[in-house]
């Protein structure tokens, strides 16, 4: 054991990032082994040929098929493409089983999405070397769940995440700080985890195009352009990341959101606002189901030319109802939509906490209003859920129901 202990750093940490390969498609293959080796896509209604590719297998990617591609285009590239409708119940169960497997190796696990998570194995030397543990995890997921994954091994979260992206599928990559100048610095800033399109544009404006330039850039200029987040990114570009694996996030929620990618560009404001309301309702239901509230509402607008705008509104009081979420989202929409056609729309509730722990700053009138309407809203939701259609609606909702239902329009247009 003492020899194995020498395989671990004396002062630093050993972090694994486990990232499942083509997760939804892999779960479908595990559920139906006859799909093995076939070009497979998880997408919308294949009969209507109007669905969007959510994910696809590596066999499908060899034909040029990619995420968000319209299904008709994917079928044109690969006529023999096998299509499955998304089964999120199946995916959630597979995710649960995946984290159950990971928990056999260490209790220090932090999920970051349905199909990826970090493990701190610094104290796991009794199980073997870091590379041996990674191989055991990969093999366990593959043999027990028939789910492939890639794993990054590094001294911190950022480098572990970066390493797991380097070899797919079924890759295991070790990334040390001494590897950064050769393996990371030559890459463009757009390739760096944590840098989106807008941040990359801001960095480009101050003549930072590569990760090396970010690492060696003037801290004051970077802070002035991007703020504290820019300094955090610069530290990571140098290989420094002080974040720790947080096991308390097992079961916690950072955000609750929904988005819709359209099969064609949309520019009619009424239809886009209808979609925004639909997404707000979905977010509200998920918050209420988990007894959560939000102090910040965010919208994302992705235009036809791939420009992406993300804006948020900080709230004085916690909210969870559809009406309040839609009100905040629609205000953001009216302030930031430039009138151009839209390809994707999203609504996300952030700054989440348990409803029982939230402290709402109420005056007498708002307290009475909330106290009166909360039981009624619960009954309305229960009745509507029971019958599957909006039997009961508020007056404001009825004014928007003069045309056929949004669900019908959605299915006719996009599914």
UniProtKB/Swiss-Prot annotation:
SUPFAM superfamilies: DNA/RNA polymerases, Lesion bypass DNA polymerase (Y-family), little finger domain. Residues 235-246 have a biased composition (Basic and acidic residues). It holds the Pfam family IMS. Residues 235-260 are annotated as: Disordered. Binds 2 magnesium ions per subunit. Its EC number is 2.7.7.7. Its main location: cytoplasm. It catalyses: DNA(n) + a 2'-deoxyribonucleoside 5'-triphosphate = DNA(n+1) + diphosphate. It is found in: Cytoplasm. Its cofactor is Mg(2+). Residues 249-260 have a biased composition (Polar residues). NCBIfam families: PRK01810.1, PRK02406.1. Poorly processive, error-prone DNA polymerase involved in untargeted mutagenesis. Copies undamaged DNA at stalled replication forks, which arise in vivo from mismatched or misaligned primer ends. These misaligned primers can be extended by PolIV. Exhibits no 3'-5' exonuclease (proofreading) activity. May be involved in translesional synthesis, in conjunction with the beta clamp from PolIII. This is DNA polymerase IV. It comes from Bacillus cereus (strain ATCC 14579 / DSM 31 / CCUG 7414 / JCM 2152 / NBRC 15305 / NCIMB 9373 / NCTC 2599 / NRRL B-3711). The gene is dinB.
